[in-house]
Amino acid sequence: MKIEATRNQWIKFAIVLVLWLAFLVWLKSWLGLVVVPFIFDAYITKKIPWTWWKKSKNETVKSVMSWVDAIVFALVAVYFVNLYFFQNYVIPSSSLEKSLLVGDYLFVSKASYGPRVPQTPLHMPLTQHTLPIVNSKSYLEWPAWDYKRVKGFGEVQLNDIVVFNFPAGDTVAVNVPAEDIYRLSYQAGKELTKPVDMSAMDAAQQRMVFDHYYKVGRQYIDEKKQTFGEVISRPVDRRENYVKRCVGLPGQTLEIKDRIVYLDGVANKEPDNVEYRYLVKVHKPIPDDLAHKLGISYEDMAYYYPEAKMYNIPLTPKTKEALAARKDIVVSIEDVPGDDAGGLYPVNKNTGWTTDNYGPVWIPKKGETIDLTLDNLPIYERCIHAYEGNDLQVKDGKIYINGQETNQYTFQMDYYWMMGDNRHNSADSRFWGFVPEDHIVGKPIFIWLSLDPDRGWLDGKIRWNRLFTCVDNIK
């Protein structure tokens, strides 16, 4: 068969082929070689009528198919770009304020830590897990590929701001998707059963009580479908995206003492814009213009008690100092101590920890082995069972993993400890534990757009001073 193709066609084919092969080398996968004959046909032989509609005499067909062709091309391009190179992420909550603000749009690099090969490859581009309007799943559970990460430019570093999949989002009640269903189950079970004093109980006795709480609470959630909706499971890469700061690396021992994070006994530097809650007693309400000047949002101002003339408000060190200087408005500013805020991780252990005084906990590291006891098992059982896929049971005070009695476990993945800079208003690792390496999505590089939810379009909605701010410069 004689192949007739112009020099220009061969050059285009060669460029595309080289790029495609380089991409496969990066992935360390040769499955993509099946695409090469189609590339060859598209540029050289043209046996498959890829653009048959261009020869149609029907103008409607030509018009419609030109749009279909453009949309399909765009979706395929977006699919590959979002999977392997970068994606957009918008800050939905105040957990990282005042480092990252609600309404910041982030350019998130997948290549910084290495992109994951998709675990659910068949999904609709530009959706995370749900199709809008119809509210159905935007992905197919088959095929399901094992976790694999392509080599990136580096690894997660201490104090990096990281985008990751929500670890406790493996099981979700669809009507309350933002809630951690495990914590919700324990809380519901505790409220529905007779109060139990666990102060004098050992670890085995506590476990029996918490197991009962969970069973009762989960049954209640399953029955109250009108309130909670169906309880569904989600694969790792289809879980909600979160963004926090990494304050603990694999193999480190983390402890929070009087609000300060210690790693292996050494205090870690707090973020420049770290926030804590304070009781601000005032002569009169804080004016809107002053609040805006100081970066205090309407959300922050919501907790105002007019009878007591007092705010319960998160402040950075600089904002606290500036507000305290306004003696015409402020009477006093007092610390608000952290508490357990409805149940800290692990939710099935009576630790007595608070958001300001937590731990110590050792962060699991790949290849490291720990001694397991009933006392430390609640801290690590989700790593062993939910994240690394082992069968874990406790019978007669003994620990069984995959049917074998054991008192040790060797971790198969690295784990990280993530926290928000808004320390008293952040659902983070203090509430749901470790972030496994297979949940890491990428690294925010810069803010490409920032919209103030408290302002109108003609009243400073666009935060021009934040545009193209490098996230690495936000310490």
Label every model-predicted segment.
Residues 1-475:
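Extended hydrophobic leader/signal-anchor segments used for secretion and membrane insertion
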